[in-house]
Amino acid sequence: MIDPLQLVAHRGLQSNYPENTLIAITKAIEAGARFIEIDLQYSKDRLPVISHDDNLNRVGANANFHFHNRNRKEIINQAAHEPGRFGDKFIEEKIPKLEDILPILNNHPEVTFFIELKQETLHQKDFQDSLNTLSKILKNVIEKVVVISFDLE
């Protein structure tokens, strides 16, 4: 038996907030989560953003918006409010950059992030290239990050 029981907040506190958003992450920590799983996608300019899908079909309002065809600057200005679940309640929530979790990691030494490299991500950048990118961005907090993926080939 694990004592105390430790849970991973999958995409943050996504039962109450739009998944993979900064509000979902911070609310999960406020609720006591010590492990947060987030998903990573890459933009056309090969920069990381936090999103499960490589498009806005579920989380945004533009079904034809695909990350691999857009620069990161365009992506991070898109709402990630999950209108199908929450209407416009979280319309101000945007697709976060990976760098946006740095202050959270710095302010919460008790929290570890599991960062999932999605299949679409590894089609744009191979696994080693992705690890190099993560290492550069997360260099000061790398000990608080675990990289996971179902597609390492």
Language-model segments: what does each one mean?
Residues 1-153:
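Phosphate-group recognition and catalysis centered on beta-loop-alpha active-site segments
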